[in-house]
Amino acid sequence: MASSSSPPSAAEAASCADVAVVILNWNGAALLRRFLPSVLAHSNGARIIVADNASTDDSVAVLAQEFPQVSLIAHAANLGFCEGYNQALKQLAPDLRYAVLLNSDVAVTPGWLQPLRQLLEERPAVAAVQPKIRAQAEPEMLEYAGAGGGYLDRLGYPFCRGRLFDTLEPDHGQYDDARPVAWATGACMVVRLSVWHALNGLEPEFFAHMEEIDLCWRLWNAGHEVWYHGSSIVYHVGGGTLHKSNPRKTYLNFRNGLALVYKNTHASELAGTLATRLTLDWVAALRFLLQGETADARAILRAHRDFYRRLSYWKQKRRQYPPRLTQQRPGVYRGSLVWAYFGQGKRRFSELDARLLS
């Protein structure tokens, strides 16, 4: 949805010269052809880098022949989302201060990057910030992966302003503000590189899914802030990595969800939160069975098995990044999103009890 515009002035281009826009790619030649032009046109002097996860299509050839101005980091194997970015950002030039984690299926708009960088410049406590995410297919709608900024409920279930479970809101300007949130989307997130490296980037055990939520939770636990800036807008296709009903995605979401809560929840809240999550996971598995989706039900069982197998690892991570009380940070709904959505029929962020929002 990005529109064309005149090239940026020298002053505008220089303003983002300390930013690297890093696009992780795996067999996405068609997406690169479709979306790289908007990134090149509207990123105002930022360095554009594609980190390729050992693609077997013609992605590397497309970059060399059609986008020679784009730098390439070629991984020798498919490292997944987490390690793909971790290894790529380790190779960035030392003069860079910020990096954008940008999905290959995102179209950016004129002026998208400057407000995000400016917020980081003006607020040293902020370590990550995301723009407003709209849907590429339905430009008037907010998009699943990020929408108007990420929240968590008291059980650690993620949702967004503008997206409760699968229910999306149209964008009427209701989230045009700039404010702290619990998490920023990995579809388009600007990070402060000094903090990224200090916290060792994304959790490699996650491979993909919920990794940005874990990172942002660790940022808050370490005393940093995560923000949303609604004056910056990008358009996301979404669903480009794994199909929505893919058992592999079910496995990653449930396994990573347990690890996310275990790693980051304060000790005083952990036992009750984890017990409730485990119970709800079994309810979800039963629901899959009743619907005939046995592969997804088995995926939940494998997720639990593998979470427990790696429990000593997750314990070490808890010690490495000590959790804080959930209510001590913004972006938290101190109620149950499951109950609000399925029990009370709430479908919009504005319908949630404001007294329970931070």
Regions found by a protein language model. Name each.
Residues 99:
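Short aromatic/hydrophobic "clamp" motif used to bind/position activated sugar donors
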Residues 74-92, 104-106:
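Glycine-rich, basic loop-to-helix element that forms the pyrophosphate-binding segment
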Residues 37-46:
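Short, acidic, metal-binding catalytic loop of nucleotide-sugar glycosyltransferases
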